[in-house]
A protein has these predicted regions:
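N-terminal phosphate-binding loop and adjacent alpha-helix
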Residues: 283-325, 451, 460-469, 562-565, ...
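Glycine-rich phosphate-binding/hydrolytic loop that grips phosphoryl groups
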Residues: 379, 392-407, 564-568, 618-655
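Glycine-rich phosphate-binding loop of actin/hexokinase-like ATP-binding domains
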Residues: 255-259, 264-292, 355-369, 403-406, ...
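Nucleotide/phosphate-binding catalytic cleft detector across ATP-hydrolyzing
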Residues: 25-26, 30-36, 42-44, 112, ...
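Short glycine/threonine-rich loop-to-helix capping motif typified by GTGT followed
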Residues: 341-356, 583, 594-614, 654-663, ...
Length: 721
């Protein structure tokens, strides 16, 4: 498709094509532009505060594009499409002698029609502009307010304590090598191989080979070690490292590359001990917060895929170097890296353009496991270091889902198990030892706090727990970084350091669950305006109502709808797999991923995010994808196992299944329109079910519709919650 790109006009709102409920850009965006060290007559100088980053860019560049090029992480949920309003900035006014700049509102182009519409609808205070719409006309200082900065998210993905049988693919072998003899003409490498075969017969499994750098260093290393050396033998036949004398420790790294966060666990390849764990935001987030925004960025910006690949490789290098420093090692001690990630991350990691994943049939370039040199990816570790990437299952069910399956092993259990990795794109596996099915469900970023008016990532100041009194509708809550609840002594003083900044993803699940249990929202998701008689926290919000948790944190009707849409997509996904399996119930539920770790299973079930089952059979498994990566790092048999298992998993494409939409509509109700959630009701006191007379009521925008008959469906009341 040929796409025009205006050079000096604000980008028009992009036309959108819907693929499996994802929005994919096929309309115009701004040019790819680079920052220059020397300023030309057509360039402007831009300085960002508080980061202090600055550079020269061509006039007509948008502020957001300049920020991306300079590495300033301005929040942009929609990927620069003028849809979210998260990328607000303020142009500095006055003379900035330090930078040699006189900055003002006229340093940016005129306010666009898109900004005017946004300001009329949601407001732009204090001279703020949308950075994705603001064109640079002159030298300028740009202030990025805290709410527009990508928060320093808490990456809570610690390694679990599961026991892993050690059978690493790389092993250390100390060998004594015969010195050269004038009467026996043999090369040093041949004698090294002979010594290795003789002294380590249980570890040598084939004809020994080596990398070129080993041949180049074998003679000086043998002599430095006085004919005693340690070699690292990979897969029983390939020498990838050699050191003089005794080398006691080498390391490997298991890395889970998520679309939002990345986590790494550095392990001792001899003992299996976790030496260090590090985590960070995925630096690709500046190109778009959800996966399809990044695919779109690559489509609309020539070389955008390479730009995103470079960003994530740089992020991986930072993680590895940080973990090595924590462990008291160097990058050269790292000989093995195992990676897992969703299909888009998987492709970008390998330098593969993910454009084909942007539309049906969502074709993968490769679905088998991949094994390459670390140097081929530009990762700086030991010269013999290798990277192993777990296989993808299909389409939008990636290597991270394979890692979850490896760690949780539903294929080894006779019980029917649902494994779900909740994220921007939920990956779902249902099955047991007889059969397994997998699907992806486009839940969107609402579960991570995006699309929520007070939503944010899990950072200090974010509400993560809440309880609402059913009689007074008064909330009590906890925020990340503060030990006390809001009604406890010392909270007000402790929270001053961070403030109450918003609601994180796991927190919004609990907030809506409590609002439903307290009667603030009805079964069809409407914020009940009649409850305003009970509490001033419920106020009119245009034609709907909202609930105030604190002075600056509010839950609106649109927030409720965003979660309804996300949870309905999740329910429809696993229900579709249950239909294919011809089963009516799930025996156990495994919530994978860092987000799943922090969801209270009760509230996930109250909202209908997971199927009805005994609450004690719902388990938060933590970062199972990372655990699977660690298993593949420390046990080569685990690699063979998952490679075989994924071939037997049946992939169901939700986009072409007629029943998906029917399940989706019914799942919009809380917890569900037709499923009574009887097991949950036996443990949690649920509100009285009020059903409409129609089989499939329209649920739009939270507006009450006239002429709808409502019937009451009593439900057995359990003990007090």
């Amino acid at each position: 498709m040929s796409v025009g790109r205006p050079a000096a006009a604000a980008p028009e709102p992009s036309k959108l094509t819907r693929y499996q409920n994802w929005h994919v850009i096929v309309g115009p965006m701004t040019d790819e532009r680079s920052v220059k060290s020397e300023k030309s007559p057509d360039d402007v100088k831009i300085v960002f505060t508080p980061s202090g980053r600055q550079g020269n860019v061509p006039a007509g560049t948008t502020v957001l594009q300049a920020a991306r090029t300079l590495g300033v992480d301005i929040d942009s949920v929609c990927g620069g499409r003028a849809l979210c309003g998260r990328c607000q900035i303020t142009p500095g006014s006055g003379e900035f002698a330090k930078h040699g700049i006189t900055s003002g509102a006229d340093s940016l182009g005129e306010v666009t029609a898109v900004e005017t519409r946004y300001a009329d609808k949601k407001g732009l205070v204090g001279g703020r502009r949308l950075s994705c719409q603001s064109l640079l006309c002159g030298d300028v200082v740009i202030d990025v307010p805290p709410e527009s900065q990508v928060h320093n998210q808490l990456v809570r993905k610690a390694a679990d304590d599961r026991q892993i049988e050690m059978d690493p693919i790389v092993r250390l072998c100390l060998v004594e090598v015969r010195e050269p003899d004038m009467h026996e003409h043999s090369g040093d490498f041949r004698r090294l191989v002979e010594a290795l075969e003789a002294q380590w017969p249980d570890r040598v499994t084939g004809a020994i080979s080596c990398d070129l750098n080993i041949l180049q260093s074998v003679q000086p290393v043998l002599r430095a070690g006085k004919w005693q050396v340690t070699v690292s033998l990979r897969d029983g036949h390939h020498i990838v490292g050699i050191w003089p004398g005794l080398k006691e420790r080498i390391a490997g790294v298991a890395i889970d590359v998520g679309s939002t966060t990345m986590s790494a666990h550095m392990c001792d390849m001899v003992t299996g001990e976790v030496l260090a764990s590090t985590g960070a935001m995925n630096p690709q987030i500046r190109f778009g917060e959800d996966l399809m925004s990044r695919v779109s960025y690559g489509i609309m910006n020539p070389g955008g895929d390479r730009e995103m690949t470079a960003a994530v490789i740089e992020g991986l290098q930072t993680l590895i170097s940080g973990a090595a420093e924590q462990a008291g090692l160097t990058n050269e001690d790292v000989l093995e890296i195992v990676l897992v990630g969703n299909p888009v991350m998987h492709h970008l990691l390998l330098g593969i353009d993910p454009v084909e994943l942007g539309g049906a049939p969502f074709a993968l370039a490769v679905d088998t496991s991949v094994e390459i040199r670390a140097s081929e990816l530009g990762i700086d570790v030991h010269p013999g270091g290798r990277v192993y990437v777990l296989p993808c299952i299909a389409g939008h069910v990636g290597a991270d889902a394979a890692g979850v399956v490896l760690a949780e092993a539903p294929q080894k259990n006779d019980q029917y198990t649902l494994v779900v990795d909740v994220g921007t794109n939920a990956e779902i596996v249902v099955g047991n030892s007889q059969r397994m099915l997998a699907a992806s469900s486009p839940t969107g970023p609402a579960f991570e706090g995006a699309q929520i008016s007070s939503g944010q990532r899990a950072a200090p100041g974010a509400i993560e727990r809440i309880r609402i009194d059913k009689d007074t509708l008064e909330p009590r809550f906890r925020v990340i970084g503060v030990d006390q609840w809001s009604d406890e002594e010392g909270f007000d003083e402790a929270v001053k350091a961070t403030g109450i900044t918003g609601i994180c993803g796991s927190g919004i699940i609990e907030v809506l669950g409590e609002m439903y249990l307290a009667g603030i929202i009805s079964m069809d998701g409407v914020v009940d305006g009649q409850q305003a008689e009970k509490s001033p926290r419920i106020e009119a919000d245009g034609r709907t109502f909202c609930y105030h948790i604190s002075e600056n944190v509010t839950v609106t009707q649109n927030d409720v709808r965003a979660i309804q849409l996300a949870k309905a997509a999740l329910y429809a996904g696993f229900r579709l797999l249950m239909d294919k399996m011809q089963i009516k119930a799930i025996d156990r539920v495994v919530l994978a991923g860092a987000f799943g770790t922090h969801i209270d299973p009760k509230y996930a079930m109250v909202l209908g995010m997971i199927p009805d089952c005994q609450l004690e059979n719902v388990r938060a498994a933590g970062n199972s994808a990372g655990a699977g990566a660690r298993m593949a790092l420390l046990n080569r048999g685990a690699r063979h196992e998952i490679e075989a298992v994924v071939r037997d998993i049946e992939k169901i494409e939700t986009a072409i299944e007629p029943s998906f939409q029917d399940h989706f509509v019914k799942a919009m109700a809380i917890p569900h329109k037709s499923d009574p959630y009887a097991k949950l009701a036996a443990e949690v006191e649920l509100p009285e079910r009020i059903l409409t007379a129609e089989d499939a009521p329209a649920i739009e925008g939270g507006r009450r519709r006239g002429g709808r008959r409502r019937t009451r469906a009593p439900i057995s009341a359990g003990p007090d919650r």
